[in-house]
């Protein structure tokens, strides 16, 4: 958990007029269940810790980095908001429930959470912050979300947006200095589906966009598609890069990749498979980037399957 998250949770407890272990009924009970936990909204990729990085299939490593980035980047949001709504509300104004504003004496920012009951059993929520380091600062929305708990426990759906630029303006001290842009997340717990859209910039200030789509199988496997526009050819021209990874609960999996556009007029595809210990058992590509290895018969998924361009 980040310093930013810890300071917020501490402020919530400190500002409550009652102990944090005390629950009040000012807010609807289903509001507390509306916000999913970080465990409910995550990409579940089997992991192994006993092998060195060099022994692992390269695209398993790439898939793991993508899932780790997503899980880590969104977990603190859900931990924070889900925890706050368990505490007594600070005020109620019609259909809007507010927690805060709160901050410790030495905190560089103060925050509040507003949750609105939309009348049909769904909720919208905003976590806003205001810098204490700049006189006259106004509250800015850092997290903006919508939650629909009506399908039942562990079956809800919703969306949330994280604005990293606003987060840094509100609290430049505790925020991640490398985080920029915004992330939009769409989740459906019943369908075991996640969508993620990122709008950011690279180190040179150039715009970067990326999309993730993830589906979890009933048996614990996964299917993830990652699309990003970036430089793979060494010139200012940008290529479209697609990586689709599929895996079973045991850990065996396959990743298929495609590069198109930019310097790669003819495009290129590649495939890699790994076993239960995440070691490569098969590799091939259409552009002779590297020699073919292994036997496709050892792949858990027999054929290449990429989404259309």
Task: For every predicted segment, state its role.
Residues 16-19:
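C-terminal motif of bacterial Sec signal peptides marking the signal peptidase cleavage site
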Residues 21-121, 286-309:
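N-terminal "mature head" segments of proteins
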Residues 81-173:
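Short N-terminal edge-element motif at the start of the domain
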Residues 95-101, 125, 160, 194-198, ...:
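Generic recognition of long tandem-repeat/solenoid scaffolds
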Residues 249-309:
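Hydrophilic extracytoplasmic domains
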């Amino acid at each position: 958990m980040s310093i930013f998250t810890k300071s917020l949770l501490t402020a919530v407890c400190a500002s409550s007029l009652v102990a944090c272990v005390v629950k009040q009924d000012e807010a609807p009970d289903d509001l507390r269940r509306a916000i999913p936990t970080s465990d409910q909204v995550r990409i579940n990729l089997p992991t192994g810790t006993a092998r060195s990085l060099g022994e692992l299939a390269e695209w398993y490593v790439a898939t793991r980095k993508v899932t780790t980035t997503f899980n880590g980047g969104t977990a603190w949001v859900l931990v924070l908001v889900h925890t706050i709504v368990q505490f007594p509300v600070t005020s109620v104004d019609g259909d809007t429930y507010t927690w805060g504003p709160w901050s410790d004496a030495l905190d560089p920012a103060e925050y509040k959470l507003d949750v609105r009951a939309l009348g049909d059993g769904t909720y919208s929520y905003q976590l806003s912050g205001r810098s204490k380091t700049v006189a006259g600062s106004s509250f800015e929305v850092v997290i903006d979300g919508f939650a629909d708990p009506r399908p039942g426990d562990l079956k809800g759906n919703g969306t949330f947006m994280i604005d990293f630029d606003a987060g840094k303006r509100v609290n430049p001290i505790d925020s991640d200095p490398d985080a920029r842009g915004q992330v939009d997340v769409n989740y459906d717990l019943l369908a075991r589906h996640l969508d993620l859209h990122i709008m950011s910039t690279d180190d040179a200030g150039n715009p970067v966009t990326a999309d993730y789509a993830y589906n979890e199988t009933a048996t614990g496997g996964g299917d993830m598609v990652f699309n990003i526009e970036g430089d793979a050819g060494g010139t200012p021209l940008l290529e479209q890069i697609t990586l689709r990874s599929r895996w079973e609960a045991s850990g065996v999996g396959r990743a298929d990749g495609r590069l198109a556009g930019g310097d790669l007029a003819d495009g290129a595809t590649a495939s890699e498979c790994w076993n239960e210990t995440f070691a490569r058992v098969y590799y091939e590509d259409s552009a002779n980037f590297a020699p073919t290895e292994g036997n496709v018969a050892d792949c858990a998924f027999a054929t290449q399957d990429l989404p259309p361009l």
